[in-house]
C-alpha cells in the first residue's frame, strides 16, 4: 500500500486511506483494476492528516475505493486491525482540522456507531454519499450488491435521526440488464419516498470481463437515456427541496 494525499487548492485535501475492493458486483471492473481491499496504517493516515493541517488546509476528504472496509490489509493481513470507526475517531481528535468529509461509503458498511459519532463530532460535516444503485431488490441481487432496499432505508433513517439536516447523496444505475419498466418504476418510487438530497445518475454501460456484460435482457440505449433523464429530473427536485 502506498500512503498518499493530494491537494487541489488551498482549502481542501484528499486523503487516501484505502484501495482495492473484495466485492464482486457484476457490473464493476474495479476489483480487476485495483486488486484486493487493503488499507493504509492508521498511524500513516494520522501523520498525513497532520501534514495537511500544517499547510493550513481547512477540509480533508477521506477517499478510497471502499473506505468503509478500512482496516483490512492494514498490516498485510486480511484482518481488520482497526475499523473505520477507529479511523474516524482518531481524525476527529486532531487539532486544527476545520472539516472532515467522508467521500462515499457502502450502506452495509455504514454502521450505527459511525453515524452517531459523526453526529456529535467536532470536525465531521453532516454529509454522506451512500451508493444505492437500484431501489429494486431484484436488480440489487442481479448486481450482486451486499444489501437489499430495506437496509438502505434503515441507513437513511439512522442518519436523519442523528442529524436531521444531513445532506445525503445517492448513486443510481439505470438500464441494468433485466431492469424492466416495472422494476425501474419500483426503483423510481423508492427514491421519491427516500429523504435524500441529490442523485448521481449513471446509465448502465457494458464493461468487458464483467458478469453483467454477458447477461440477457439487455435494456435498449434509448430506454436507458429516458430513465436517466427521469432520475436527473427527480434529483433537481430533491436538491431544491433540501436547500429551500
Model-identified regions with their sequence ranges:
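Anionic-ligand binding region
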Residues: 211-218
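Contiguous mid-protein beta-loop-alpha structural module that forms a pocket-lining wall or clamp
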Residues: 179, 193-196
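Proteins enriched for Cys/Gly/acidic motifs involved in redox and nucleic-acid/cofactor modification
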Residues: 1-71, 83, 113, 128, ...
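A generic short-segment signal for beta-strand/edge and adjacent turn/coil regions
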Residues: 30, 95-100, 108, 219-226
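Conserved SAM/AdoMet-binding glycine-rich loop
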Residues: 54-181
Amino acid at each position: 500500500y502506498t500512503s498518499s494525499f493530494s491537494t487541489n487548492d488551498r482549502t481542501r485535501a484528499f486523503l487516501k486511506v484505502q484501495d482495492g475492493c473484495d466485492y464482486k458486483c457484476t457490473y464493476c471492473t474495479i476489483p480487476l483494476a485495483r486488486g484486493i481491499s487493503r488499507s493504509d496504517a492508521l498511524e500513516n493516515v494520522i501523520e498525513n492528516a497532520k501534514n495537511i493541517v500544517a499547510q493550513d488546509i481547512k477540509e480533508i476528504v477521506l477517499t478510497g475505493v471502499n473506505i468503509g472496509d478500512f482496516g483490512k490489509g492494514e498490516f498485510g493481513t486480511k484482518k481488520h486491525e482497526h475499523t473505520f470507526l477507529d479511523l474516524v475517531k482518531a481524525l476527529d481528535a486532531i487539532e486544527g482540522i476545520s472539516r472532515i468529509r467522508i467521500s462515499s461509503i457502502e450502506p452495509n458498511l455504514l454502521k450505527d456507531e459511525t453515524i452517531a459519532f459523526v453526529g456529535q463530532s467536532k470536525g465531521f460535516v453532516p454529509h454522506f454519499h451512500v451508493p444505492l444503485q437500484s431501489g429494486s431488490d431484484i436488480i440489487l441481487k442481479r448486481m450482486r450488491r451486499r444489501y437489499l432496499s430495506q437496509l438502505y432505508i434503515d441507513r437513511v433513517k439512522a442518519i436523519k435521526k442523528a442529524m436531521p439536516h444531513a445532506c445525503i447523496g445517492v448513486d443510481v444505475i439505470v438500464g441494468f440488464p433485466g431492469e424492466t419498466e416495472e422494476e425501474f418504476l419500483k426503483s423510481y418510487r423508492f427514491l421519491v419516498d427516500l429523504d435524500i438530497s441529490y442523485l448521481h445518475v449513471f446509465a448502465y454501460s457494458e464493461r468487458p470481463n464483467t458478469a453483467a456484460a454477458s447477461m440477457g435482457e439487455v435494456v435498449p440505449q434509448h430506454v436507458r437515456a429516458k430513465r436517466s433523464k427521469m432520475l436527473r429530473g427527480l434529483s433537481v427536485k430533491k436538491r431544491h427541496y433540501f436547500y429551500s
